[in-house]
Regions:
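Noncatalytic alpha-helical scaffold of FAD-dependent oxidoreductases
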Residues: 1-193, 197-261
Length: 261
């Protein structure tokens, strides 16, 4: 919640990226070669914010550093806001960001699958919304879920590791998706942001947009694709159970294969 207070101030600065990474995301990469030592010292509940800014000259760049630090002065941090112009150091920081999903998914419990989704919220509610989403994840026994996102856009990704080899695992996942939908919509958020609506989220489009708009979507689909040849069932799908059908299970094989995503 505290980290999300930075979204509105950062939008007033010359910032090209502000990447949010939760503690589970950082934990997934903290033991990789070249990772900053500070990652291993972070407490549970901590998050990191990777800010990228650039300029054509050193004077302008230093001014931008100062402006960003000033805008974030009201945000409580575990470590002081700091910047670097060392190419090797900032490349290390970006390796943290780029490697977190694959590292987290490869380290998931054996026999589970990795399911990734992305949601979005307005900047003024992002902190409260993500806190609630994290509570939903915990209630549905996904405490190891990994969360990261593009803070400036209010867009957050998360990946969970359900065991769909068991019927109760599928039932638990279905219950989670419904409560996730309810939580996102309660905060006036979007069930999709950066990526398209696939079969996993299709059953919840009607709830998100309401009957009238959903009916209009279906009319447009029928008009432009009367034979339903283009991505059938991906966005418009009247089967409320489609997201838990034809799931690709992950039987145990060997230690190497079980890490595949």
């Amino acid at each position: 919640r505290e980290a999300c207070k930075s979204i509105l101030p950062l939008r007033q600065c010359s910032v090209s990226a502000a990447e949010l990474m939760d503690r589970n995301a950082l934990r997934a990469v903290e033991n990789e070669p070249g990772m900053p030592e500070t990652l291993r010292t972070l407490p549970d509940g901590a998050v990191a914010l990777l800010i990228d800014t650039s300029a054509d000259d050193e004077v302008t760049l230093q001014k931008q550093f100062a402006e960003i630090a000033e805008k974030l002065s009201d945000v409580q941090t575990l470590y002081p806001v700091s910047f670097t112009t060392d190419p090797e150091l900032y490349a290390t920081y970006w390796r943290v960001r780029s490697g977190l999903f694959t590292s987290a998914a490869a380290g998931r419990p054996r026999g589970t699958v990795s399911i990734i989704e992305d949601i979005a919220f307005r900047g003024d509610v992002l902190g409260d919304a993500l806190t609630d989403v994290r509570e939903v994840l915990a209630r549905h026994r996904y405490p190891d879920a990994v969360m990261w996102g593009h803070l400036l856009d209010g867009n957050v990704h998360f990946t969970i590791f359900p065991d769909i080899n068991r019927p109760e695992g599928v039932e638990g996942y279905a219950a989670f998706m419904q409560e996730l939908t309810d939580t996102v919509l309660r905060h006036d958020g979007s069930l999709k942001a950066e990526h398209g609506t696939g079969r996993n989220m299709a059953p919840f489009v009607r709830q998100e947009w309401g009957e009238d708009i959903y009916r209009l979507m279906k009319d447009i689909k029928k008009l432009l694709d009367p034979r339903n040849l283009l991505n059938p069932g991906v966005l418009i799908n009247d089967d409320p159970q489609v997201f838990i059908k034809n799931l690709k299970k992950m039987p145990l094989a060997n230690d190497l294969i079980d890490r595949c995503i």
